[in-house]
């Protein structure tokens, strides 16, 4: 039973809304005529140095990483002459949560942009961005490597504008950070209560009579090729094991989930996409971008599409070639059905989550504080929460909470606490035996340079080259406890000094493939607004997302009901829509 409900004022909801949709002015000057960083008292404007003005999407990752990289870059170039009569460089930034149009970029006074979301192909086709191809393909002055060498084939095609055979690479932006929505678990609570699946043939928790943990979702244990497969030992390997664990938590007086209220709908919606991606794998997920290719795991429907064909209670799976005649069949992918069932089981049982789990006056920072303090002597409630739905960047966002707790007792510092990034469970035993792990990056984060800069252009380009160097990538991870979207090795020093959460995230990333939710296929670019992960599974069944609809049980009473209605919607878009594939 829940013993304490946090009553947050309506004012807090207003603040949350303001924060979520706030925008920054397009390079408004400070009183001294400078731009950016006006609030940083230890960094006064210095007109004896070349100025580079940065805009950053300042949300969950915050901007401490940027302050540190700016300082390092300034030190490395303190004697560099970028402009006649000036020596050295000063980098200053502003930031908020905002998506930029091409005209916004052209009319701003910023030189470099760290973006999240936004239409990259609209920007590059409008002439708003600088061609940075030579920067990407030349050896860097900071690590003697090309940035291109740290990118995968999909990134090269997307950022390089390779839209067809024979098209030459031309870069106007580069990857930035990488973020996934997932489950964070309180390892301290898991350890205290023994919330680990045992290696018994029948599903059970570890106990005095059997303290041996299962091998977890990856099906392995021990260390191999720099990966510690034992870090997920005992974590639930399948959906059924996961919800068995939730039931055991309730029996022991622990609430399984902390949900972020105002953002619960959005966060769980992205978690749903992560579950789909984990099920489908890279190749099958790409069908959601291209709508061309061989689909191998479509759920078979009856002749009029109103029911799922089942055998022994499970959906029958079939294959099909996807093209312009049947693009809608991608919405029969089995991963979507099973992920919907996971969401249904998660949100329809109110005892599974905090009372403010869907209260819009309760924010993600409220949730972070309650989750972090849960089980400690600083909690205002005796309620304990085992898991939290948030992004892989959550520790950077919750930094103030950790710091305030550490001021009262060092044992509560971020370094000394023990949270973990949970490997997602598999839909069933068959998917578990396949052994695939996929990290969904849905942020569309990028760094780019404004076109037609003046005397500071070289400094701006150098800064972008620097932030993509190995040392800067490593420092980003060290500061944020999160990842950049490049192929780089976190240094031994950074890993050894990292807290437990960071190690679990790095380890999970090492053993997983990454699926980036963007594409430069013509069909996707034309219909991007409908096909984004935040939108694609929200427009077929109204009103709301799978999360609220399955929670309320009105528009769709079950995962199967929602699945069929969503498929029907995309099929009804008709040949005029799908022929463009």
Q: Where on the chain are the PLM-derived regions?
A:
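Short, low-complexity disordered leader/linker segments with a strong preference
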Residues: 1-51, 575-581
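Extracytoplasmic "Venus flytrap"
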Residues: 46-48, 52-68, 179
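Short, polar/charged alpha-helical segment
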Residues: 59-85, 184, 188, 271-275
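Extracytoplasmic "Venus flytrap"/periplasmic binding protein-like
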Residues: 78-158, 192-193, 379, 386-387, ...
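Extracytoplasmic/periplasmic substrate-recognition and gating elements
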Residues: 85, 165-169, 225-226, 383-384, ...
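Hinge/lid segment of periplasmic solute-binding proteins
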Residues: 117-182, 188, 203-223, 299, ...
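Glycine-centered hinge/linker elements that transmit conformational signals in sensory
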Residues: 244-246, 283-366, 424
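C-terminal capping/gating helix-and-loop segments adjacent to ligand/active sites or protein-protein/ligand interfaces
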Residues: 480, 502-581
């Amino acid at each position: 039973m829940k013993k304490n409900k946090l009553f947050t004022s309506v004012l807090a909801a207003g603040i949350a809304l303001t924060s979520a949709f706030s925008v920054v002015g397009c390079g408004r000057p400070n009183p001294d005529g400078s731009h950016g960083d006006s609030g940083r008292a230890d960094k006064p404007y210095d007109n004896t140095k070349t100025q580079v003005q940065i805009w950053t999407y300042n949300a969950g990752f915050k901007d401490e990483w940027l302050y540190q990289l700016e300082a390092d870059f300034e030190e490395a170039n303190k004697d560099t002459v970028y402009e006649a009569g000036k020596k050295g460089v000063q980098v200053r930034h502003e930031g908020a949560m905002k998506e930029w149009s091409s005209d916004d970029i052209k009319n701003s006074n910023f030189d470099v942009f760290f973006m999240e979301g936004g239409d990259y192909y609209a920007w590059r086709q409008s002439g708003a961005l600088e061609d940075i191809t030579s920067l990407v393909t030349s050896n860097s002055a900071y690590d003697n490597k090309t940035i291109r060498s740290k990118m995968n084939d999909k990134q090269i095609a997307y950022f390089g504008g390779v839209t067809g055979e024979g098209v030459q690479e031309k870069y106007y932006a580069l990857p930035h950070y990488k973020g996934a929505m997932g489950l964070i678990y309180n390892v301290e609570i898991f350890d205290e209560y023994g919330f680990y699946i045992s290696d018994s043939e029948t599903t059970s928790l570890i106990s005095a009579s059997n303290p041996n943990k299962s091998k977890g979702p990856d099906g392995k244990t021990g260390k191999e090729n720099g990966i510690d497969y034992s870090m997920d030992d005992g974590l639930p390997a399948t959906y059924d094991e996961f919800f068995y664990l939730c039931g055991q938590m309730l029996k022991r007086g622990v609430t399984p989930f902390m949900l972020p209220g105002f953002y619960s709908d959005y966060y769980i919606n992205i978690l749903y996409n992560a579950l789909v991606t984990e099920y489908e794998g890279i190749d099958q997920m790409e069908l959601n971008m291209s709508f061309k290719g061989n689909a191998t795991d479509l759920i078979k429907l009856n002749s009029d599409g109103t029911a799922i064909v089942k055998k022994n209670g499970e959906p029958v799976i079939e294959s099909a070639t996807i093209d312009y005649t049947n693009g809608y069949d991608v919405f029969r992918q089995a991963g979507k059905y099973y992920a919907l069932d996971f969401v249904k089981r998660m949100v329809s049982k109110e005892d599974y989550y905090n009372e403010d789990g869907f209260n819009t006056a309760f924010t993600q920072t409220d949730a972070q504080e309650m989750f972090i303090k849960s089980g400690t002597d600083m909690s205002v409630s005796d309620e304990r929460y085992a898991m939290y739905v948030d992004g892989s960047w959550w520790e950077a966002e919750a930094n103030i909470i950790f710091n305030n707790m550490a001021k009262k007792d060092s044992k509560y510092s971020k370094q000394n606490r023990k949270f973990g990034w949970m490997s997602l469970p598999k839909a069933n035993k068959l998917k578990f035996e396949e052994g695939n792990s996929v990290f969904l990056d849905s942020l569309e984060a990028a760094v780019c340079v404004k076109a037609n800069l003046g005397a500071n252009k070289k400094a701006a380009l150098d800064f972008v080259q620097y932030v993509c160097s190995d040392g800067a990538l490593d420092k980003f991870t060290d500061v944020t406890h999160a990842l950049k979207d490049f192929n780089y090795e976190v240094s031994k020093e950074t890993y050894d000094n990292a807290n437990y959460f960071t190690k679990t995230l790095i380890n999970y990333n090492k053993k997983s493939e990454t699926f980036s939710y963007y594409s430069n296929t013509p069909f996707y670019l034309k219909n991007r607004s409908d096909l984004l992960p935040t939108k694609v599974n929200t427009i077929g069944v109204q009103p709301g997302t799978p999360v609220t609809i399955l929670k309320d049980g009105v528009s769709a009473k079950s995962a199967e009901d929602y699945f069929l209605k969503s498929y029907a919607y995309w099929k009804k878009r008709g040949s005029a829509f799908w022929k463009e594939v």
